[in-house]
């Protein structure tokens, strides 16, 4: 749960062994400690759906990542054109039933959990355990279990990388910012991030993206000018020393992120590759972005001598020859 905090709060852990019943572990109840060692340190895969945040919590609360994971959203993307299928859609596809959604927005940090919440949480993992063999069978039929293992290994690798600081260009409305706006936006974004992390607050409770963008577009050149747009008791003033230092520094505006520029010839090759990827994805019955994103293709066309994920793993079998032929 991340509704009221900067760091996600673990509200409940649900597990279900194949053929067994669900077990609910309450991390907010000291008498019912989560068996992290059993969950994280065994050879059987931990099955998740859209599990990036689950993995973040495992690392944060359990101190480690599982040895092996199997993300069912990734697995279904490898055997269908649906890049990000929802849990409910997955259950409906394999089991032909509509899972209960009544407790999705429930307050999972409130205690005690009611019977409806506990039943909902148990069904959540029991249905996942039931559909998992069907997904495995479909991937085995398509000879794509190795693809799934590769994509899940990449998911674990991404979780071990340092988290990138929140940057101005991730703000809602960032594309409309001009150079002078971007300097102020970056300063305010950094100050907001520092305060949110220090006090474990959601960014939006300190300052919404919309408010931040509006102030940045005024381009206050100094801290004194910024004070015209922030109330005296605004929480961002808790970062006064940092704000003072950053406004006093004569730093140029951050550059606008841009995609590589392609020559006329490279542009033609890029367009051919996009068409090839789209056609190949249709043949494989997967989403084109799973095979190769536009960004990855463009970077490859701009610098074909550089290493690329398109030249490794299961993608290489479908892309390497075409990439080398065109470029």
Could you describe each region identified by the protein language model?
Residues 74-78, 109, 210-214:
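Conserved short loop/turn motifs at secondary-structure junctions
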